[in-house]
């Protein structure tokens, strides 16, 4: 690595890899802000469309700007016939993140970014189209139905649920999906976002950057924690069973997903927000078992390991109460985080230098080639 500055720590933990004006994560041990606004404030007082506008365009919209933005996004929900045909060829047992990756890449073939002047338009298009992509594939491959991907729903969260279930969602479900999308919208230099920025630093197109980010999120160490949490809690009978199951896993030193975080030291601010909504959903659902066992898991993990729930853990029960199949949990993350990814791509482009770090060589010493007859 010669004169390059030495970066230490597994996975470059604690290292600064650049500057961003989009978000802060864990500055006080537990905080999360988007362009200066606390995520709790946004979740309580804004919609996801307002937050998307904030992240992509820099400020919260006025009433007129929000109305125009919602109208724009609603007009971008439809999918090209060629993309639908590709989605119909993807089997039902495919990994849904592969569907998202393929859908994004195919859209890039059909609606290519010819100039960076189109970047905001493409960011909005991806934000509007991603729920349509995953739901069109799911409904066709699992139900044999070719759905109309354009609905009159005012919000993206409601639109997703409408496409998935074939009917308009309740006010409660609409609100919870809206909050969920806000909580997942942006999170600084995580693995998928940094992947998008590295790709952007080569001056690649927006679809390639986002496709790369999806590929990064597909890995189980980054995405999928809410799916793993659902697999953990779904068969727990009650609080006592939850404690027994978790204690067994701890004794066997098994990794338990949905707890702790790479950046937050004290708590994940998103957890308390979605936990509250999960409790409300449980009451509405009429069976609070999954919520109760989740609370028991949370208490035990803190008691035994001093590990707090991250954003993913109570999302599992919340999504379940809204009738969302477990395999679609991570694609919902994509439908939200595409906001942050595309904003980071644009930020990288605005003050760009190709990201090309050095590496410490740990291989063999210099040597000579031995003729093949003598090896």
From Swiss-Prot:
Keywords: Transferase, Tricarboxylic acid cycle. This is 2-methylcitrate synthase. One of its GO terms (molecular function) is citrate synthase activity. Substrate binds at residues 72, 187, 270, 337, 356. GO terms for biological process: carbohydrate metabolic process; propionate metabolic process, methylcitrate cycle; tricarboxylic acid cycle. NCBIfam families: cit_synth_II, PRK12351.1. GO terms for cellular component: cytoplasm. CDD domains: Ec2MCS_like. It catalyses: propanoyl-CoA + oxaloacetate + H2O = (2S,3S)-2-methylcitrate + CoA + H(+); oxaloacetate + acetyl-CoA + H2O = citrate + CoA + H(+). The gene is prpC. PROSITE patterns: CITRATE_SYNTHASE. Its EC number is 2.3.3.5, 2.3.3.16. Homodimer. It is an enzyme of class 2 (transferase). InterPro entries: 2-MeCitrate/Citrate_synth_II, Citrate_synth-like_lrg_a-sub, Citrate_synth-like_sm_a-sub, Citrate_synthase, Citrate_synthase_AS, Citrate_synthase_bac-typ, Citrate_synthase_sf. CoA binds at residues 255-259. Belongs to the citrate synthase family. The active site is at residues 222, 261, 312. Signal peptide: none annotated. Involved in the catabolism of short chain fatty acids (SCFA) via the tricarboxylic acid (TCA)(acetyl degradation route) and via the 2-methylcitrate cycle II (propionate degradation route). Catalyzes the Claisen condensation of propionyl-CoA and oxaloacetate (OAA) to yield 2-methylcitrate (2-MC) and CoA. Catalyzes the condensation of oxaloacetate with acetyl-CoA. It comes from the Bacteria. Pathway: Organic acid metabolism; propanoate degradation; Carbohydrate metabolism; tricarboxylic acid cycle; isocitrate from oxaloacetate: step 1/2.
